[in-house]
Regions:
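A structural signal for multi-pass alpha-helical bundles of membrane permease subunits
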Residues: 1-223
Length: 223
């Protein structure tokens, strides 16, 4: 999810900054609207559109593109609800990365791109050796915070799945729960406070160590 959000936002920023794109201000309105709407409203809207009684599943069944048992959000759905969660997370997060990358790219030195073109570098090589290192240098802390936020993204599956169901094979959880959702169930629903606290400490230790290693190893810290 972090990879999709980051490079999706960076790709949109590069697209909007391209000289061949016209009406740039008009196209920027659409991600701005996705960013401005509160996330829980967006998630409830996606829940309505993709539930069994929603318009998207209904149209797919009406057009005979899927069978009558097809479902995306239900108590036994697994990969469909996970893919929908990835899509919703990207819908909510990509605009913020796009705005951040747009501001960073506006400070890029055009002389280095001109020199690269004179040396025969194509567009992909310019992106790989000039744009990407330049943006990564400034956004490494943002990547770390986005990675941690995805671990704690409680609202994605809490608002997407309409009912609180437990699936066999999972301990007080279902197939779409993140760790934060699972800890919520353990503490609030099942009153297993000791287990929830232990899992919270383990998750915190993992994220703290990972973030420290990545940040210390990044060029942003070394320079």
């Amino acid at each position: 999810s972090t990879f999709i959000n980051y490079f999706g936002g960076l790709g949109l920023a590069l697209l909007y900054n391209a000289k061949c794109v016209k009406w740039k201000r008009v196209w920027r309105i659409f991600p701005m609207l996705a960013y401005a709407i509160p996330s829980f409203i967006t998630l409830r809207a996606f829940n309505f559109m993709f539930c069994d009684a929603g318009p998207i599943v209904g149209l797919l069944k009406e057009w005979k593109w899927v069978d009558s048992n097809f479902t995306i959000i239900s108590f036994d759905s697994k990969w469909s609800i996970r893919l929908l969660g990835f899509f919703c997370c990207a819908w909510i997060s990509i605009p913020s990365i796009m705005f951040l990358s747009t501001g960073i790219l506006s400070n890029a030195n055009n002389d280095m791109y001109e020199a690269a073109r004179l040396d025969g570098a194509n567009g992909f090589q310019q992106f790989l050796y000039l744009t990407l290192p330049f943006v990564l240098f400034a956004t490494t802390p943002i990547i770390i915070s986005t990675f941690i936020a995805n671990f704690n993204n409680f609202s994605i599956f809490y608002f997407l799945r309409p009912e609180e169901t437990l699936v066999s094979g999972y301990f007080n959880a279902n197939s779409a729960d993140l760790l934060i959702n699972w800890m919520y169930r353990l503490t609030v629903d099942k009153k297993l406070y000791a287990l929830g606290s232990a899992l919270s400490l383990i998750l915190f230790a993992f994220m703290a160590i990972f973030s420290l290693i990545v940040y210390v190893s990044s060029p942003a810290y070394k320079k």
